[in-house]
């Protein structure tokens, strides 16, 4: 059996351990202190036996969710090369999911679109300062009829007009 394979693995493990110890040394004393305090409180909670004070059912899920969320964030931050201090910076920031948006009060459009259009056109006419205070919807109807008549006559004229070629 070749023992050189095991020595290579041992060297890799030792290098990884040195890298991890350097990361711990580079982190601030404050973050190490917080980490040790968290470990102590976790150990106290694990070792405590006996009746616990009842907590409301609403507080427990929020606390667990917050803890899981911060652990997940801490894990992601560390993967990106950050530290626990970076987690503290973003701890109070709310995500988009937590923000509540209020829907603006919008007027529901009327079932009959022509009434709404006529009202908007009436307001537009008032803003432009026309002498009439209200828009006459009948004018809209006659205008559209005039346009269709013009279109019909122009299409008839274009069909009846012969274009002479340069054969003469």
Curated annotation (Swiss-Prot):
Keyword Coiled coil in record = no
Task: Give a yes or no for keyword Acyltransferase in this entry.
Answer: no
Q: Where are the transmembrane segments?
A: none
Q: Where is the region Disordered? A: 21-114, 136-168
Composition-biased stretches (Acidic residues)? 82-102, 159-168
Q: What is its main location?
A: nucleus
Composition-biased stretches, type Basic and acidic residues, lie in 34-62, 103-114
State the UniProt keywords alphabetically.
Answer: Nucleus
Cell location: Nucleus
One biological process GO term for this chain? ribosome biogenesis
One cellular component term (GO) for this entry is: nucleus
Q: What is this protein called?
A: Uncharacterized protein C589.03c
| UniProt organism field | Schizosaccharomyces pombe (strain 972 / ATCC 24843)
Q: Upper taxonomic classification of the species?
A: Eukaryota, Fungi, Dikarya, Ascomycota, Taphrinomycotina
